[in-house]
Amino acid sequence: MAKLSNDELIEAFKELTLIELSDFVKKFEEVFEVTAAAPVAAAAAPGAAAPAEEVEEKTAFDVILEAAGDKKIQVIKEVRALTSLGLGEAKALVDGAPKAVLEGANKEAADKAKAQLEAAGATVTVK
């Protein structure tokens, strides 16, 4: 039997009906003792959903100051109000953005801090 190129095989498959192609796949699986890959992909989907559930159950959040914005002095004041930092330390934190303002805060405290910092003109993310 002559060896067919990939292009020749594709052209041969194009001429088959769906039923003939399905029969070919079944015969191919029997002869080479393989199965379709679809069940493997279906088994991987539930595993991918598990990390999303863990994120929803997260209880400790970090408030990250991404940028101070135009009102840098107001942002420094808010950082001082949210933390126990002195003026120099708060200024260094704001100048060194992106940096964490709060770490390990609960959801309510993190959202409150984010709102206060954004009201002062900062760009903030909660992780």
UniProtKB/Swiss-Prot annotation:
Q: Which UniProt keywords apply?
A: Ribonucleoprotein, Ribosomal protein
GO CC list: cytosolic large ribosomal subunit
> Is Signal found in the keyword set?
no
Can the keyword Ribonucleoprotein be found in this entry's annotation?
A: yes
Q: Which residues cross the membrane?
A: none
Molecular function in Gene Ontology = mRNA binding; structural constituent of ribosome
GO biological process terms, semicolon-separated: translation
Name of one Pfam family that matches: Ribosomal_L12_N
Q: What is stated as this protein's family in its record?
A: Belongs to the bacterial ribosomal protein bL12 family.
**Biological role:** Forms part of the ribosomal stalk which helps the ribosome interact with GTP-bound translation factors. Is thus essential for accurate translation.
Q: Which NCBIfam families match?
A: L12
- Relate the assembly described in the record: Homodimer. Part of the ribosomal stalk of the 50S ribosomal subunit. Forms a multimeric L10(L12)X complex, where L10 forms an elongated spine to which 2 to 4 L12 dimers bind in a sequential fashion. Binds GTP-bound translation factors.
Spell out the protein name for this chain. Answer: Large ribosomal subunit protein bL12
